[in-house]
């Protein structure tokens, strides 16, 4: 190949082997929405598609702006626990936290989302209980989310998210791949969940 593109330190070994073999390699390490947009711009430059990349970025930025404007109408923000893995339990990576905020929610563990390594985002069942999420979103990377398993955890039956049926799945392909899909698919699903929660709250008044 003329160029190999990879992502994160997880591909460091194979990248090193390719470099030693004389292959040109570019490894991205995007963890935020702004870094994802920059990755698209750089990829466009690397493959001679700068204009197409700029058009895609403009489309994605429009989606982000529309989500931001829609969320500005909400007077209350639900607390959202995003679970990336179940054993051990891992909370949201930075871009997932940012998407939750954009859609009008508050991430339960924003202080952990900035950590690059998943092991630094491990949480306990008790910590989640203490944060009292209104919404639980599961996106177990590479395997099917099991809401019944989540709801059966000790003391989770008393959580608002469980009592009111706001334990939901977003497919990992839609939100955990660090590219356009987390905006075109992931964000829109988070918006739909939060908008449903807002309607539910309005009915309680």
PLM segments and residue spans:
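Residues in soluble alpha-helical coiled-coils and helical-bundle/repeat scaffolds
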Residues: 9, 48-51
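Helix-loop "lid/cap" segments that line or gate small-molecule binding pockets
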Residues: 40-48
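Binding-cleft/active-site segments that stabilize strongly anionic ligands or cofactors
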Residues: 1-34, 63-184, 188, 196-205
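Mid-sequence helix-capping/hinge segment at a functional interface
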Residues: 50-70
